[in-house]
């Protein structure tokens, strides 16, 4: 089974890191290679442009693809969106010059809009009943309003810095995007696909969590349990030969700083905090 992964750019390293954390170490995934094996003999990696990945999956060259929702929507491939991988977040926005006088998309009827996403842009304006001339460009979209190529643009933004640097302001949000795990509909229910999806989900579920272990006198257990903000009831185990129990619990990382003094005050000792690599419910 092949997984298509971005071959370069801002999505490349996070995608490889996710594979690594999920237990699918990529063997010799150098920049110039098109294919690479993983430690699982049934899973290999195909490196491709992020924009091409939806087509590779739709054509059966890969069973799974890691790419942005914006790329899949632009490709019109109708893949199965299995999982939001929670990185590469961005927005596709309609923007125009700050002094251009465009305050609503309806004002662009009969105007010109430049974009690297012509299909998404066309659908967006069709839903609004607006008919601008859409010009496809392959880069430097934000410059087009300043050289009289377009009245507005539809482009990707993460922080808005590039738009502000080019004296552009957001008129409307077209699409909110992030990197997803997509599947060919023909194999979406395959057991191996489910195994990979579960592995990825376990990594995401572990993010922001910490595993707490502590020793607690039996007569302090109720007081300690009252201070535990964990995902569920803690695991409590007897410690041989002592009037003490070992308490294990998963908590949100942001709660650790506040909860440790409360646990100590309630009677817990030998508190150990560790990271969690993967969490499978």
UniProtKB/Swiss-Prot annotation:
Reactions mediated catalytically: 1-(5-phospho-beta-D-ribosyl)-ATP + diphosphate = 5-phospho-alpha-D-ribose 1-diphosphate + ATP
Gene3D superfamilies, A to Z: 3.30.70.120, Periplasmic binding protein-like II
InterPro entries: ATP-PRT_HisG_long (IPR020621), ATP_PRibTrfase_cat (IPR013820), ATP_PRibTrfase_CS (IPR018198), ATP_PRibTrfase_HisG (IPR001348), HisG_C (IPR013115), N-reg_PII-like_a/b (IPR011322), N-reg_PII/ATP_PRibTrfase_C (IPR015867)
Known regulation of activity: Feedback inhibited by histidine.
Coiled coil (UniProt feature): none
This protein's pathway: Amino-acid biosynthesis; L-histidine biosynthesis; L-histidine from 5-phospho-alpha-D-ribose 1-diphosphate: step 1/9
Protein name (record): ATP phosphoribosyltransferase
Species the sequence originates in: Natronomonas pharaonis (strain ATCC 35678 / DSM 2160 / CIP 103997 / JCM 8858 / NBRC 14720 / NCIMB 2260 / Gabara) (Halobacterium pharaonis)
